[in-house]
Swiss-Prot record:
Binds 1 zinc ion per subunit. Its cofactor is Zn(2+). GO terms for biological process: ribosomal small subunit biogenesis. It is found in: Cytoplasm. It comes from Alcanivorax borkumensis (strain ATCC 700651 / DSM 11573 / NCIMB 13689 / SK2). Keywords: Cytoplasm, GTP-binding, Hydrolase, Metal-binding, Nucleotide-binding, Ribosome biogenesis, RNA-binding, rRNA-binding, Zinc. Zn(2+) binds at residues 301, 306, 308, 314. Residues 109-277 form the CP-type G domain. One of several proteins that assist in the late maturation steps of the functional core of the 30S ribosomal subunit. Helps release RbfA from mature subunits. May play a role in the assembly of ribosomal proteins into the subunit. Circularly permuted GTPase that catalyzes slow GTP hydrolysis, GTPase activity is stimulated by the 30S ribosomal subunit. This is Small ribosomal subunit biogenesis GTPase RsgA. Belongs to the TRAFAC class YlqF/YawG GTPase family. RsgA subfamily. One of its GO terms (molecular function) is GTPase activity. One of its GO terms (cellular component) is cytoplasm.
Length: 352
């Protein structure tokens, strides 16, 4: 379903209401800080491990080893930018019972964002080192959708690994298609892991990929992200959904973003399922840089302002004709480029 388009007056009205709410929250926060300052301990480092609306869960980062980890529910100052799971913060624990307070955010190494319902950028996870792009035989994988995740990873500076889940569903009919799709991405340098979460088969490569990194699973609903987390971290016991018999799409089962620690080292951020994935505020030049093999070739085009569509001497077209790049990837680039609207925001729904 298309997103609601707002006129200038409606956007001004929404921004005015939001500004008034922020002002009221800031005044309340100033009063609360005066009242509770004496009840808080010394400032210390921490990491946001969960977000619950007006409160967050903070894990203390002071002291080495898992035995020193403690978590505490906290308020956060209204003057802070939006907190997300994975944020490294400065916080003050309560001296007795009660809630702590997050007082500052440390600089982010990376931030993963997506547009909200008004088209504004909204961070969903911070300090992610690796994006695990999950796909499965069902719902039927789309290279165009996979490319969207990979472009997002490239532009965010996050390493990407593709994870083919539900390998037990691959029959003789599906195998050639799945192998061709996987080989296309392996040829580009993206690792592709083939696993089966329900049977715990082939999870060793996934454990190795997760070790020592902060990772996030992405992918359309129904591909088994929660099942994979249960496979590598059984005590997480995340709810698992079935595919809808009507749409063939999965049902969203994760309702709160959360950071969990893995026995082999590293952290995993599980965030609510994303059925619609937009490429935020980008133009065609940015989109081009999200395609690593196309970006390398673009400088060899005959014309500096080449649109890579039908100009003579276009290096991308020549490379596709010569078999040096995959025609499917170039077609996906064209498709995504065509969906970029005039203000640079792309709209795409995996429901379609």
């Amino acid at each position: 379903m298309a997103k609601r388009k707002l006129n200038r007056r409606q956007r001004w009205r929404i921004e005015k209401i939001q500004a008034e709410k922020r002002d009221r929250a800031n005044r309340r926060t100033d009063q609360q800080e005066i009242l509770v300052a004496d009840d808080l301990g010394d400032e210390q480092h921490g990491v946001i491990t969960a977000h619950f609306g007006q409160q967050v869960e903070v894990e203390s980062a002071d002291g080495p080893g898992a035995e020193n980890r403690t978590t505490r529910r906290c308020h956060f100052r209204a003057t802070l930018e939006q907190l997300v799971v994975g944020d490294k913060v400065i916080w003050q624990p309560p001296k007795s019972e009660g809630l702590g307070v997050v007082v500052a955010i440390e600089p982010r190494d990376t931030v993963l964002k997506r547009p909200d319902m008004y088209g504004n950028l909204k961070p969903v996870a911070a300090n992610v080192e690796q994006m695990l792009v999950v796909f499965a035989p069902l719902p039927t994988p789309s290279s165009s959708l996979l490319d969207r995740y990979l472009v997002a990873a490239e532009l965010s500076g996050i390493a990407a690994t593709l994870v083919l889940n539900k390998a037990d569903l691959i029959d003789d009919t599906l195998r050639p298609f799945v192998d061709e799709l996987s080989d296309m991405y392996r040829h580009l340098g993206y690792p592709v892991l083939e696993v089966c979460a329900h049977q715990r088969e082939g999870l060793t490569p996934l454990h190795e990929a997760l070790a020592g990194k902060t990772s996030v699973f992405v992918g359309q609903s129904g591909v088994g992200k929660s099942s994979l987390i249960n496979g590598v971290l059984p005590e997480a016991d995340l709810q698992v959904g079935e595919l809808s018999s009507n749409s063939g799409l999965g049902q969203h089962t994760t309702v709160t973003a959360r950071l969990v620690h893995l026995p082999t080292g590293g952290q995993l951020i599980d965030s609510p399922g994303i059925r619609e994935f937009g490429l935020w505020h980008i133009g065609e030049d940015d989109l081009l840089h999200g395609y690593r093999e196309l970006s390398e070739l673009a400088g060899y085009c005959k014309f500096r302002n080449c649109s890579h569509r039908n100009e003579p001497g276009c290096a991308l077209i020549l490379a596709a004709q010569n078999g040096d790049i995959d025609e499917e990837r170039l077609a996906n680039f064209y498709q995504i480029s065509d969906t970029l609207n005039e203000d640079g925001r792309e709209r795409y729904s995996t429901d379609s």
